[in-house]
């Protein structure tokens, strides 16, 4: 083989090698493009995933902030309710303490009243016994007084009748020689601060009544007043 043939063969071999290299380069370029494309897709996907994750985290953060705000408001509301409940509890406690004090005061008052009632019952019982004893003594004394009164009336010619708590009637007899049983009466009101003559029988003059009534209220001597009235009735019989 001559030189030209060897050169041509070498050229052909080089062309074949170039073509093979070109094919490899093309394949490498395609593979590189695919890798770049895949890499870009992966980067884009990661970027989207990252954005989505950031967005999700942002949303979660917003929701958590809302929840935190809501919890804070609930916490404040709960604290306010607790403070109000505590104040109410303190007020109720104070009221309960006041009621306990009032109850104790009532118990003490009740005990004092019961003690006073017992003392009063004892005093009433003692007073009742003394009153019964006094009534018995009074009844006995009244019986004696009736006897003495009858003697007194016969001796003095005067009967005393109590008509009410305010009126007393004094009746004189043994004044009229023609009729010793004839009665002469004067009714005296003793209910006020001063005595007043309500009526006389037989009737004395108004001037005479005013005169003896004035003397009675001035001197306050009933016995002297009765003596003067007896004298007036006796003079009345003589005239």
Curated annotation (Swiss-Prot):
Cellular component terms (Gene Ontology): Ndc80 complex; nucleus
Pfam family of the protein (one): Spindle_Spc25
Claim: Coiled coil is one of the keywords in the record: yes
Localization: Nucleus; Chromosome, Centromere, Kinetochore
UniProt keywords, alphabetically: Cell cycle, Cell division, Centromere, Chromosome, Coiled coil, Kinetochore, Mitosis, Nucleus
Coiled-coil residue windows: 19-139
GO BP of this protein: cell division; chromosome segregation
Function: Acts as a component of the essential kinetochore-associated NDC80 complex, which is required for chromosome segregation and spindle checkpoint activity.
Similarity comment: family membership: Belongs to the SPC25 family.
Quaternary context: Component of the NDC80 complex, which consists of NDC80, NUF2, SPC24 and SPC25.
Name of the protein in its database record: Probable kinetochore protein SPC25
